[in-house]
A protein has these predicted regions:
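Bacterial N-terminal signal peptides that target proteins for export
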Residues: 5-27
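Transmembrane beta-barrel domains of Gram-negative outer membranes and organellar outer membranes
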Residues: 40-267
Length: 267
């Protein structure tokens, strides 16, 4: 979700660095990395967008995210995200998280989490009458130790479609897709999200999102939530991203509190 500068110009277009979506439905069962944001998804939000990094440009994020449930806290401290414009309309993506899991009744664990790999492709440009459209398939590897709550325990695949439209100082993006997850007790599920943001000044953009997951862990049920946040452009290369929110349904089991803060370098 998140701040995204796909060129060396100040961030104005979207509020999402990239993808880190940690969905902690049961800390004792697993910490699920989704796009995203919590979010391994579109920093600083769970919802992502179709806009790739410009050709031969780079984005590097150093970020941390947290999710709190009735079972404890989990997240990243930090995670590194890198995006590269490998071709016109095509972006390569990787996230390497240092994850932590701190259950209410149990030992705090930390270590390598599930590495995320992805390719974003924009196949429709935005015009006055139509939105930008793209796809951003992701693979969540199972590099994290699931027995310690640092990973999912099996590879996940996410197949989303994203749309984006801008009107002056306002911009909105959203969409969703299907998660394929073969981990024990996990269910394949859908994620949908929509975001709206406004350029408050040359340096500051603020926005919010709503999102919904269908059931991810057997017997847990689906969940909905929201985040409020934004990004601040210090200059054309250096950016601060931030968000916080909570669940609206199934709150205690899935999201009593979530937060994201990150530094983004673009060149």
């Amino acid at each position: 979700m998140g701040a995204r500068s796909h060129s060396t110009e100040p961030l104005r277009a979207s509020m999402k660095p990239c993808n880190v979506k940690y969905v902690a439905g049961s800390l004792l069962a697993c910490t699920m990395l989704m796009a995203p944001r919590l979010a391994l998804a579109g920093p600083p939000f769970m919802t992502d967008d179709p806009e790739p990094v410009e050709y031969r440009h780079h984005e590097l994020y150093i970020s941390s995210q947290l999710v709190k449930t009735q079972d404890g806290r989990s997240g990243t401290l930090p995670h590194l995200e890198y995006n590269y414009g490998a071709a016109p309309d095509l972006q390569l993506h990787i996230i390497v998280p240092y994850a932590f899991n701190s259950p209410v009744h149990g030992q705090r664990e930390s270590g390598l989490g599930d590495v995320e790999l992805g390719i974003k492709y924009r196949f429709m440009q935005e015009t006055d009458s139509r939105p930008m459209v793209g796809i951003f398939p992701l693979v969540e590897t199972h590099t994290g130790d699931a027995s310690k709550g640092l990973g999912n325990g099996a590879t996940q695949v996410y197949l989303p479609v994203w749309l984006q439209k801008r009107w002056g100082k306002w911009q909105s993006y959203g969409g969703g897709g299907y998660w394929i997850n073969n981990a024990a007790n996990a269910r394949n599920h859908w994620f949908f999200g929509w975001q709206l943001q406004k350029d408050v000044s040359e340096h500051l953009t603020l926005g919010g999102e709503i999102f919904h997951n269908t059931e991810q862990i057997s017997g847990q049920g689906g969940n909905s939530g929201f985040n409020l946040g934004g990004f601040y452009n210090f200059d054309k290369h250096n950016h601060l991203l931030f968000s916080a929110g909570r669940g609206l349904t199934n709150v205690n089991m899935t999201n009593q509190l979530s937060s994201y803060v990150g530094y983004q370098l673009t060149w």
